[in-house]
Swiss-Prot record:
This is UPF0060 membrane protein sll0793. The keyword Mitochondrion does not apply. It comes from Synechocystis sp. (strain ATCC 27184 / PCC 6803 / Kazusa). It is found in: Cell inner membrane. Keywords: Cell inner membrane, Cell membrane, Membrane, Transmembrane, Transmembrane helix.
Length: 108
């Protein structure tokens, strides 16, 4: 269940970040307006994938925020060639701990 939930978070994150990045390319870098169509599809898929989480809405979206932080840093580093420093990674690690506690800690 944990692995599936993490997979849903990653899928949702890639769709949301990818969709946002396409808007960035279109508006800020003058790329084709057709990117807006792909963006709309990705952001729609993001909204759907998020509903697959077993947790309630508030917990799932709060935890997703931590995953979004991590994926955004990785996206910037790998796709946009941004230099990521140790404080970026530290912040991402702290966010990940929060995600793990919120989503997967044993609630007795």
């Amino acid at each position: 269940m944990i692995l599936r939930s993490l997979l849903y978070f990653v899928m949702a994150g890639l769709c949301e970040i990818g969709g946002g990045y396409l808007v960035w390319l279109w508006i800020r870098e003058g790329k084709s307006v057709w990117l807006a169509l792909v963006r709309a599809i990705l952001l729609t898929v993001y909204g759907f994938v998020a509903t697959l989480q077993p947790a309630n809405f508030g917990r799932a979206y709060a935890a997703y925020g931590g995953i979004f932080i991590i994926l955004s840093i990785i996206w910037g580093w790998q796709v946009d060639n941004v230099v990521v420093d140790r404080l970026d990674w530290l912040g991402a690690a702290i966010a990940l701990v929060g995600v793990l506690v919120m989503m997967y800690a044993n609630r007795a």
